[in-house]
Amino acid sequence: MFEGPVQDLIDELGKLPGIGPKSAQRIAFHLLSVEPPDIDRLTAVLNKVRDGVTFCAVCGNVSDEERCRICGDARRDASLICVVEEPKDVQAVERTREFRGRYHVLGGALDPLSGIGPDQLRIRELLNRIGERVDGVEVAEVIIATDPNTEGEATATYLVRMLRDIPGLTVTRIASGLPMGGDLEFADELTLGRALAGRRAMA
């Protein structure tokens, strides 16, 4: 254990996802060794993110405006919605250059053991988007692109149950080419693109 601000810094860094005690200590001592202007730039960026980044009022993606760039793009197909768990998954799908619709970010996946049920996700907002139409366009297809793990599959099953009886709506699930237990964000562009192209209709 170190003392004072150094230990405080290590403790805070250790709260970040994927950062263990040793990594937190290594990052902390790196920060102590860099020049003050570099620290100032990092601090400025963190403050900018805190003050200027929010979540899109329409889809839930990260944005620096009320509406994200994708939701504000009239060239995107508003009749097609791809449902993902997190904003990072939006970027994964975008890298494939295979999808020209819009997105809906749930903000996670169903995980009862962690206290995450339907009310903790943006499922109601999805139903509202479909019911109210998107920019006056009727939603024709919802692609479920949750992660291929236990929580993602449970979420997909729940969504199918909620959506399948909506008249005129096709509900599809990305193909099973992704490795089970993986995260969408780590899939390569080719594999994810094929999973999108090979999506299957859900009964």
Swiss-Prot record:
SUPFAM superfamilies: Recombination protein RecR. Keywords: DNA damage, DNA recombination, DNA repair, Metal-binding, Zinc, Zinc-finger. Residues 79-179 form the Toprim domain. One of its GO terms (biological process) is DNA repair. It comes from the Bacteria. InterPro entries: DNA_Rcmb_RecR, Hlx-hairpin-Hlx_DNA-bd_motif, Rcmb_RecR, Rcmb_RecR_Znf, TOPRIM_dom, TOPRIM_RecR. A zinc finger (C4-type) spans 56-71. GO terms for molecular function: DNA binding; zinc ion binding. May play a role in DNA repair. It seems to be involved in an RecBC-independent recombinational process of DNA repair. It may act with RecF and RecO. Belongs to the RecR family. HAMAP family: RecR. This is Recombination protein RecR. It comes from Mycolicibacterium vanbaalenii (strain DSM 7251 / JCM 13017 / BCRC 16820 / KCTC 9966 / NRRL B-24157 / PYR-1).
